[in-house]
Curated annotation (Swiss-Prot):
Keywords: DNA-binding, Host-virus interaction, Inhibition of host innate immune response by virus, Metal-binding, Suppressor of RNA silencing, Viral immunoevasion, Zinc, Zinc-finger
Record-stated family: Belongs to the carlaviruses nucleic acid-binding protein family.
Basic as annotated region, ranges: 44-47
The protein's name: RNA silencing suppressor
Pfam entry (one): Carla_C4
Zinc finger (C4-type): 54-69
InterPro entries xrefs: Carla-bd (IPR002568)
GO molecular function, one term: DNA binding
Role played: Suppressor of viral-induced RNA silencing. The potential mechanism of action is based on sequestering siRNAs.
Gene Ontology terms: biological process: regulation of DNA-templated transcription; symbiont-mediated suppression of host innate immune response
The species this protein was found in: Potato virus S (strain Peruvian)
């Protein structure tokens, strides 16, 4: 989260530094809220579709060969990829 704020600050200073003083840019960044990814099922499905995974079991979907995933009644396996689960569920780092 700190990296996002620093990136936003640098972008603000770079873009608005010649119009606004740096102190005003820092004040804007300190008041601004960091946007949070949605946690609804729609947003989970959207993120899963963007990386080609099932939003319920985190397997590759559509399956390459015979798979336990039908995208309706599937369940997560014993050890799903934690990075994929974190991305699909929208958990922050």
């Amino acid at each position: 989260m700190k990296a996002e704020r620093l990136e936003m600050l640098l972008l603000c200073v770079y873009r608005l530094g010649y119009i606004l003083p740096v102190d005003v840019c820092i004040k804007i960044i300190s008041v601004a809220q960091v946007s949070v990814q949605g946690r609804s099922t729609y947003s989970c499905k959207r993120r899963a579709r963007s990386i080609g995974r099932c939003w319920r079991c985190y397997r590759v979907y559509p399956p390459v060969c015979n798979s336990k995933c039908d995208n309706r009644t599937c369940r997560p396996g014993i050890s799903p990829n934690f990075k994929v689960v974190t991305f699909i569920r929208g958990w922050s780092n």
